Design a protein with these regions (language model features):
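A short Gly-Trp-Pro
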Residues: 1-110
Length: 110
């Protein structure tokens, strides 16, 4: 999902609720699946966040956050789809596509 969207691994921060977006009138939304949406800047194309509203999931693109102090890279998703060309050195929780979809209760994956 993220690799095809951005050409490489995507880094996001799970929001506690729906993302509070300043300048929402500049945001376009692409429905990428039955349950998921990609939100991006309609002016420059920057990836802003990914949402699965029915599951209450909002992943904010890390590059859009001014201060990442105190945040840690803890989880890799879609690990079964990861290409062999890279591997992260730090220990992380690794979720397959099926495990991630079940975690966010995506329709059809209950």
């Amino acid at each position: 999902m993220c690799r095809r969207w951005g050409g490489g691994p995507g880094f996001s921060v799970k929001a506690a609720g729906e993302a509070d977006v300043v300048g929402r009138d500049h945001v376009s939304i692409y429905k990428s699946s039955e349950w998921g949406f990609r939100h991006f800047c309609r002016d420059c194309g920057t990836h802003l966040f990914y949402s699965a509203p029915s599951a209450g999931y909002f992943g904010v693109s890390a590059g859009t956050i001014d201060d990442l102090t105190g945040l840690a890279f803890t989880t890799e998703i879609y690990i079964d789809c990861k290409p062999d060309v890279y591997a992260f050195a730090n220990p992380t929780r690794k979720l397959t596509e099926a495990e991630f979809l079940a975690m966010i209760a995506a329709p059809g994956n209950e």
